[in-house]
């Protein structure tokens, strides 16, 4: 599970699809990395949700406000928001500057810095450290100070790939969770069989993957 020797290459902005649904698929199998003074924490992305333009559950749907301003940055920036008044969650801005859309990172497979993740989430089993958007942000040490961060710099908090691999793994698709509207839309993407996927465990075997 953890591989602190994994060699990662930063993703540049022109590597990222400029489309919310395409980006949600593309990010599967990529890595979210946080370089800390004490070392690196990182996880392989195994679950995402798309919140495209025109979706009423998209936080930018009502227009630009102080709380969602980073969603209108250029694609590849972070939108970090507070949810349920408790947890911060990490989104990747997914459309051209001024548009307002993002992809939520829902789950990671830990690959580096397990000891620091466990220090932030004491008493948590390894399988639950990063299984869910609030859990993974806490495990990686990502809070409101990262809202608006550029994830394409290869420094601080950034997106990476293993070597030059850019093609996502086979994925499955289902409906989003934790929302009250537009619940029928198939905008949640995940790596089938991964024990780190959040929500019901039936997703481990319950839905056939769609090719990437």
From Swiss-Prot:
<dbReference type="InterPro" id="IPR036995">
    <property type="entry name" value="MPG_sf"/>
</dbReference>
<dbReference type="GO" id="GO:0003677">
    <property type="term" value="F:DNA binding"/>
</dbReference>
<keyword id="KW-0378">Hydrolase</keyword>
<dbReference type="InterPro" id="IPR011034">
    <property type="entry name" value="Formyl_transferase-like_C_sf"/>
</dbReference>
<dbReference type="GO" id="GO:0006284">
    <property type="term" value="P:base-excision repair"/>
</dbReference>
<comment type="similarity">
    <text>Belongs to the DNA glycosylase MPG family.</text>
</comment>
<dbReference type="GO" id="GO:0003905">
    <property type="term" value="F:alkylbase DNA N-glycosylase activity"/>
</dbReference>
<dbReference type="Pfam" id="PF02245">
    <property type="entry name" value="Pur_DNA_glyco"/>
</dbReference>
<keyword id="KW-0227">DNA damage</keyword>
<protein>
    <recommendedName>
        <fullName>Putative 3-methyladenine DNA glycosylase</fullName>
        <ecNumber>3.2.2.-</ecNumber>
    </recommendedName>
</protein>
<dbReference type="InterPro" id="IPR003180">
    <property type="entry name" value="MPG"/>
</dbReference>
<keyword id="KW-0234">DNA repair</keyword>
